[in-house]
Design a protein with these regions (language model features):
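RNA substrate-binding interface of SAM-dependent RNA methyltransferases
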Residues: 38, 99-150
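Boundary-proximal intrinsically disordered activation/regulatory segments immediately upstream
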Residues: 1-54, 138-139
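Acidic/glycine-rich phosphate/pyrophosphate-binding loops and surrounding catalytic core
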Residues: 84-100, 138
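A residue-level signal for conserved active-site and pocket-lining positions in enzyme catalytic cores
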Residues: 29, 87, 147
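Structural motif
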Residues: 26, 47, 86-88, 105-107, ...
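Short, aromatic/basic amphipathic alpha-helical patches
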Residues: 54-62, 145
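Glycine/small-residue-rich loop that forms an oxyanion/phosphate-binding "nest" at active or ligand-binding sites
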Residues: 62-90
Length: 150
């Protein structure tokens, strides 16, 4: 059974100010979660549907795993049709560093659509562009739709 405290955490992380204050963010869906498992991000807890767990047996070894119905996942999710899983993850401390202007970088101003920012991140990775500068008016990097589309 999923504790109410975990539900509240997931619901709160749909809002930028709560992601900033808690230093946590959401990863939703199998594809994004599989990428997360390859990274060195620390997972706080994961909520997974019974159906997904039956198909992805290696997920059973994860710590802090809560198994619920697909309907419960869909109700909690910020995405349209997420019936698989939601994971709460610790942010990394992104350090501001000096910019090497001799290398290619991307500068963004007022990108408001999370899907567009995710696509730009994917393209930057494809072209091995290591620096992306975002104005304060650009959508939150840790928005779950940015995470999913990147």
């Amino acid at each position: 059974m999923l504790p109410k405290s975990k539900i509240k955490v997931v619901q709160s992380l749909k809002h930028k100010k709560n992601r900033i204050n808690s230093n946590l963010f959401l990863v939703e869906g199998i594809k994004s979660f599989d990428e997360l498992l390859k990274s060195n991000y620390k997972i706080e807890f994961t909520i997974i549907s019974k159906e997904t767990l039956a198909n992805k047996k290696h997920y059973k070894n994860l710590n802090d795993l809560y198994v619920v119905s697909s309907a419960e996942i869909n109700k909690l999710s910020g995405l349209k049709n997420n019936k698989s899983l939601i994971s709460v993850v610790h942010k990394k401390n992104l350090k501001k560093k000096s910019i090497d202007f001799s290398k290619l970088l991307i500068a963004l101003d007022s990108v408001s659509d999370p899907g567009n920012l995710g696509t730009i991140i994917r393209i930057a990775d494809w072209f091995n562009i290591k620096s992306i500068l975002c104005s304060k008016n650009t959508v939150d990097l840790y928005n779950s739709k940015v995470i999913q589309s990147s």
